[in-house]
């Protein structure tokens, strides 16, 4: 019976399952969007929401607790500095699961799990990136193009032909 048993086993041992979820939450926070199977995404949603809630509290104690789950220092800093600030007003539900169909190899049900405010964060960052791209294009247009260097590949077939002629 499964009375009062919470969570999924995902056909893994306890150690493997916790290691997998820690790696997945680190990837989710780094990229803010990952593609995985639907059962894994549902478990990851529970796990990631708990880690983000720790980051929202923001104390040194909560940073240490989150450090047990997030295995990369850069991602941990990103979590506490930027991601937690974006979710200050939201009481929960920090991730979204979108089903994307079935995997070709084994017909597994696949889903995208992403942070809810990812689109808003990309819009703010996207405007800055667009400005940077236009600046780079303008700088490239101003620079004169250099003359191309002569190719060495044309000399190689002649050398091979000479060697063959010398051998015969």
UniProtKB/Swiss-Prot annotation:
Compositionally biased residues, Basic and acidic residues: 121-146, 159-168
Cross-referenced Pfam families: Ribosomal_L17
Region (Disordered): 121-168
Gene3D superfamilies found in the cross-reference section: Ribosomal protein L17
Start-end of Basic residues biased regions: 148-158
Coiled-coil blocks: none
Disulfide bonds, paired cysteine numbers: none
One Gene Ontology cellular component: cytosolic large ribosomal subunit
Subunit structure as annotated in this protein's UniProt entry: Part of the 50S ribosomal subunit. Contacts protein L32.
Similarity annotation: Belongs to the bacterial ribosomal protein bL17 family.
Protein name per the record: Large ribosomal subunit protein bL17
Source organism of this protein record: Anaeromyxobacter sp. (strain Fw109-5)
